[in-house]
């Protein structure tokens, strides 16, 4: 199998273009759990016809699909972008035949074991993956009773939500200076998202990859906040938060926050305690000075100009 994978891998990466299956309801790669191996997979195709045949399999389940063309120079970025969402296998299809290749044969995850946790890029593959599975199912245009395993998917996502810490973008005011001091003195501005109906939300991000995808060239910095702190970070004029607005875009309103706090208090406490320990380690190590975080190991794929089918999803409008 290793030899077969070696030649198959070489065959895949030598192609000038691949078509990746994206889910229209999440603006992210379509994720699929293999019913036998239970590997979390993303599917790629040698041509458009192969993708269309695959998409047809899911049309009856009302799962919208679109093919995104990935140019050869963007392969590293694309496969690297699958690491933060917890994918373990890539399934390649050509001429009706499919084969699964472990993701780590395309791209290696950076070893951060010797880096203090507060300096590592924030990662949250469990939250990302369960969120994608949930939204693929929840946004199907079918009656709720026809949605497969919706309750269990929802519970698994909420547990991961309760355990998580998030990145919240801020704009630091007043020029140069210690960021922590500016935060304490209120010299920061929060980033808001204004909806077409007039509602205002604040973006939060599950990981550094999603934050950087949203940030692009803007001079945003990030506050790290556990789930337990979201309620206090939401003023009266804000309806809630949008998790990963450049990706699956999940609304987290006050009702959902209260539900999670009530149903999963132990998980919320674990997440808050873990965040406190990381922040305390940063204070003790830096002695009050703020050092630049390690950059995320991969960049978001840039499909503009490389897709003959559709463009990669953009960001939600931002004020």
Indicate where each model-derived feature is located:
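An interfacial alpha-helical scaffold signature
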Residues: 1-319
């Amino acid at each position: 199998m290793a030899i077969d994978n070696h030649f198959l891998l070489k065959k895949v990466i030598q192609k000038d273009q691949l078509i990746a299956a994206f889910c229209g309801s999440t603006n992210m790669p379509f994720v699929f759990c293999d019913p036998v191996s239970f590997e979390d997979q993303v599917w790629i195709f040698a041509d458009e016809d192969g993708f269309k045949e695959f998409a047809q399999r899911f049309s009856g389940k009302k799962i919208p699909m679109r093919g995104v063309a990935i140019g050869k120079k963007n392969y590293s970025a694309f496969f690297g972008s699958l690491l933060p969402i917890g994918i373990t296998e890539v399934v390649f299809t050509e001429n009706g035949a499919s084969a699964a290749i472990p993701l780590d044969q395309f791209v290696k995850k950076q070893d951060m074991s010797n880096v203090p946790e507060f300096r590592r890029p924030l990662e949250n593959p469990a939250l990302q993956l369960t969120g994608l599975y949930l939204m693929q199912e929840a946004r199907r245009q079918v009656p709720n009773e026809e949605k497969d395993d919706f309750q269990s998917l929802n519970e698994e996502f909420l547990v991961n939500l309760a355990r998580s810490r998030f990145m919240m973008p801020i704009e630091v005011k007043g020029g140069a200076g210690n960021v922590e001091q500016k935060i304490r003195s209120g010299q920061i501005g929060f980033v808001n998202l204004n909806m077409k109906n007039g509602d205002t939300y604040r973006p939060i991000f599950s990981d550094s990859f999603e934050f950087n995808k949203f940030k692009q060239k803007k001079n945003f910095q990030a506050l790290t906040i556990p789930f337990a702190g979201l309620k206090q970070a939401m003023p009266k004029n804000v309806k809630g938060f949008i998790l990963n607005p450049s990706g699956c875009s999940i609304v987290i309103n006050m009702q959902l926050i209260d539900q999670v706090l009530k149903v999963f208090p132990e998980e919320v406490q674990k997440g808050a305690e873990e965040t406190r320990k990381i922040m305390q380690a940063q204070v003790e190590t830096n002695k009050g000075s703020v050092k630049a975080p390690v950059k995320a190991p991969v960049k978001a794929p840039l499909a503009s100009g490389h897709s003959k089918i559709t463009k990669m999803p953009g960001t939600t409008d931002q004020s």
